[in-house]
C-alpha cells in the first residue's frame, strides 16, 4: 500500500501567495473605503465616494487640530501604559512563579480577576476612589487604571517564561559568583525577552483602543482618538470620523502587516529549504 496517501500535501508557494493576497484584500477593503471618505466632504448612502474631493479632513489634521492632538496624546498614553504594564507584569510573574502550593494558585487566580469584568465597569467602580485621591480627569489616573488590565495580561503571558530552565540558569549564575544584575542579564533576560515585546504591544494597543476607561476616569479631560471619534460620529462629521478611524486602526494594521509579511517570508524559506533537501 502506498503510504503517501495518508500524508497531507503541504501547500505550495503559489497557493500561499494567493491565500495571503486574498486575506490582505479582504482586510484592506474597509480601510480603502475609509480612506476614500477621508479625502473629501459630505457623503450620501449608498455611494462609495464623498460628495466632493477637497482633502478637508487632512488639511485640518495638518494644522494641528484637535484630532492630531488627540492622536499624539493617545500615542503617549499607550506607550506609557505598555511600559508600565510590561514592567509590572515582569515583577508580578516572577513573584508568583517563586510561590509554592496554594499561595501560587491564589496568585494565579488573582491575576485573572481583572478579566472577569469589562474595563468600562471597572472604571465606573474606580471613579470614586480616583476622585478622592485627585486622579480623576488626569493623565496619571487613566494610565494607572489602564495599567491594571495591561499588567494582568502581561503577567499571564510572562508566567510561561519562568520555567525550570530559567531557574537552573539563575542558580548557575549565582554559583559562579554573579550578582543580581548578572542574574537578570544572563539568566532572566534571555528567557523572557521574546515575551516582553508581545506584552508591550498588547498593552499599548489596549490603551490605544480603550474607550471606557478614558471616558469615565478621564472625564473628557484626557483627549484620545477614541473619544474624538465618537464625538465626530455624534456630530455627523462622517469624513472626519473616517480619518479618525484610520488613525485609530493604523498601529494595529501596521503590526498585522509586519507580522503577515514576516510569516510569509519564514514560510517561503521553509518551503525552499524542503525543496532543496528533496
Label every PLM stretch briefly.
Residues 2-13, 79-111, 124-128, 170, ...:
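Transmembrane-helix boundary motif in ABC transporter permease subunits
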Residues 19-21, 27-31, 141, 147-148, ...:
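Transmembrane alpha-helices
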Residues 1-36, 256:
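N-terminal signal-anchor/first transmembrane alpha helix
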Residues 29-32, 36-39, 87-91, 124, ...:
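Membrane-embedded alpha-helices of multi-pass transport/permease systems
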Residues 103, 120-151, 181, 217-220:
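Membrane-interfacial helix termini and adjacent extracytoplasmic/periplasmic loops
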Residues 72, 76, 102-108, 165-199:
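Amphipathic cytosolic juxtamembrane alpha-helices at the membrane-cytosol interface
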Amino acid at each position: 500500500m502506498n503510504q503517501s496517501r495518508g500524508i497531507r500535501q503541504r501547500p505550495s508557494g503559489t497557493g500561499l501567495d494567493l491565500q495571503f493576497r486574498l486575506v490582505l484584500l479582504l482586510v484592506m477593503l474597509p480601510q480603502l473605503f475609509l480612506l476614500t471618505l477621508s479625502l473629501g466632504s459630505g457623503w450620501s448612502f449608498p455611494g462609495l465616494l464623498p460628495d466632493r474631493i477637497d482633502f478637508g479632513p487632512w488639511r485640518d489634521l495638518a494644522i494641528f487640530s484637535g484630532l492630531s492632538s488627540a492622536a499624539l496624546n493617545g500615542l503617549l498614553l499607550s506607550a506609557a501604559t505598555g511600559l508600565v504594564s510590561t514592567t509590572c507584569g515582569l515583577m508580578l510573574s516572577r513573584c508568583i512563579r517563586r510561590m509554592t502550593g496554594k499561595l501560587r494558585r491564589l496568585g494565579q487566580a488573582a491575576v485573572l480577576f481583572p478579566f472577569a469584568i469589562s474595563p468600562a465597569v471597572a472604571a465606573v467602580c474606580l471613579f470614586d476612589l480616583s476622585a478622592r485621591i485627585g486622579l480623576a480627569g488626569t493623565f496619571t489616573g487613566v494610565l494607572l487604571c489602564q495599567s491594571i488590565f495591561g499588567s494582568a495580561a502581561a503577567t499571564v503571558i510572562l508566567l510561561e517564561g519562568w520555567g525550570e530552565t530559567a531557574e537552573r540558569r539563575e542558580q548557575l549564575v549565582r554559583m559562579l559568583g554573579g550578582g543580581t544584575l548578572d542574574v537578570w542579564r544572563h539568566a532572566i533576560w534571555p528567557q523572557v525577552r521574546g515575551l516582553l515585546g508581545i506584552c508591550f504591544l498588547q498593552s499599548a494597543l489596549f490603551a490605544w483602543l480603550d474607550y471606557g476607561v478614558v471616558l469615565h476616569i478621564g472625564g473628557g479631560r484626557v483627549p484620545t482618538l477614541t473619544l474624538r471619534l465618537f464625538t465626530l460620529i455624534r456630530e455627523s462629521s462622517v469624513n472626519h470620523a473616517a480619518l479618525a478611524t484610520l488613525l485609530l486602526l493604523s498601529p494595529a494594521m501596521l503590526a498585522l502587516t509586519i507580522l503577515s509579511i514576516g510569516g510569509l517570508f519564514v514560510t517561503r524559506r521553509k518551503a525552499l529549504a524542503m525543496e532543496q533537501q528533496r
